[in-house]
UniProtKB/Swiss-Prot annotation:
GO function term, MF aspect, one: 16S rRNA (guanine(1207)-N(2))-methyltransferase activity
Protein name per the record: Ribosomal RNA small subunit methyltransferase C
Gene3D superfamilies reported in the protein's UniProt record: Vaccinia Virus protein VP39
Catalysis performed (reactions): guanosine(1207) in 16S rRNA + S-adenosyl-L-methionine = N(2)-methylguanosine(1207) in 16S rRNA + S-adenosyl-L-homocysteine + H(+)
Amino acid sequence: MDPRSEVLLRQRHLFATPLLLAGLPADDLLAELPQAQGWSWHAGEQAQLDARFPDRSRFDTRAPTGAWTSAVLFLPKSRELTDYLLASLAARLPGGELFLVGEKRGGIERASKQLAAYGKPRKLDSARHCQLWQVRIEQAPAEPDLHALAQRYSLPLADGELQVVSLPGVFSHGRLDRGSALLLGQLQALPGGHLLDFGCGAGVLGAVLKRRYPASRLTLLDVDAFAVESSRLTLAANGLDGEVIAADGIDGAPRELAAIVSNPPFHQGVHTDYQASERLLQRAAEHLAPGGELRLVANSFLKYPPLIERHLGPCRTLAEGDGFRIYSARRS
């Protein structure tokens, strides 16, 4: 059981009426709280919840409707995303109770101050290195417009500016990260055919791929619902076509790909987690057509070349700079 869920269950008498669990982990919490429904924006956790608790959780960027008398937000990493989620929940709960639970190292003390916009916050419990806070909604806001909260910026490129649309919670929100900047300079001479932007974030790499290889089919994939929606908005802002899908890692990707291009993810909430990246390297060959190429950026200190060569083929370093390296390997 996730420690945040354990903290909630210490106060289970507060959660006997219909409530919404926003950002809930894929554990036994729904079994313990039969009146609860879930709202998830993580495709992997949603798949696990669907398998165990059919029709009790929804995958979306917007709060589901329901006769909730209270809601719990599991604190996400991003402050901007926390603002959006709290406002979304508070808008559905005039006079109701909104709870916030999170790890101390994840910033729950700081985030608890964000509850003050809706009433007087109070700490209910502290255990398992987590805290539980509560506020009664005295000032219910209007439901926030997610797209109005997007940060939009122009990326100057050799073939013209690219418009990027970044929603709260998306990696490197509102700016181009250093790894992707290095990879953008190494997208030449990719095989033609079906291209995949794995871990697409706001869709920068995928949009550049479609602009540079207009005849190629493009798929963008991310585990996060906000990233999926950001990528769709970025493609639309540039008049580009592409399929954007939500999936938990490379196992959810199409097969017979001409190339996989990636700045792979390495965070799960506040924790560093290289599992999705390592699984990409281990399974890329299963999703590439013969002669298909994996091209990715990674921190220089990560020992990826041996893993790439073990599972795919000879690994070349195409570029290095600013603490990152660009690796390339082809399926034989």
